[in-house]
Amino acid sequence: MFQISSFGKKIGKVTGIGELMNDIGDAMQKPGEVILMGGGNPAKIQEMQEVFHSLLNEVSDLNRFSKIISSYDSPQGNEDFLQDVAKYFQRTFGWNITRNNVAITNGSQNAFFYLLNMFSGKFPDGSKKKILFPMVPEYIGYADQTLEEDTLRSYLPKIEYTGKHSFKYRVDFDALKIDESIGAICVTRPTNPTGN
C-alpha cells in the first residue's frame, strides 16, 4: 500500500499561511479592484516598477541571459551578487561582513524554514530547544515551519490602549522567560501596512 512519510503528511496538510495565500490568490482572480492589505507587498510603487523593468531589460542581453539560464552558480549563490550584498551592508551599516556572511534563499518562508529548524528541536547532546516569540499575535507563516512538534514558545502581550479605537501590543518583559531551553529568539512585526 502507498504511504507518505510523516514529513510528507506535515507539508501536505492545510496550514494557516496556505489558506491565507489561497484567499489572496482567489481574490486576485476576481474582476474589479482589490486593495491588498497583506500577504505580499501592499503597494505598487511606480518608481520601483520602473527600476525593476530596467533591470529585467539588462538581464535580457543575450550573453547575460544565456549565463543566467544555462550555468549553475555555486551552492551559496551568484558570486557577484554575494559580493554586492556584502558591500551594501558594509557601506550602509558599517558592518564588517564578507560574502561568507550572506545566505541566499528562495524567499522569506524558505529562509525561516532553515533558521527555525537549525535552532529548534532535538540536538546532538540530547537536549531539545524551542524558538521563542516574545509575543503573539505573530506572522501565521511561522506556525508550520518546524519539522518537529512543540518547538515554538510565545507569550501573550501587554495591550496599550492608544485611543478610543486603537491599541498597541507590547512585550510583557515581566512574564518573559529565557533559559537553556530556548535555541533562538525570533523578533518580527509583519503587520502590513502599519508596521505596528
Predicted regions and their residues:
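Conserved core of the PLP fold type I
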Residues: 67-196
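N-terminal "arm"/small-domain region of PLP-dependent enzymes with the aminotransferase-like
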Residues: 1-76, 87, 91, 174, ...
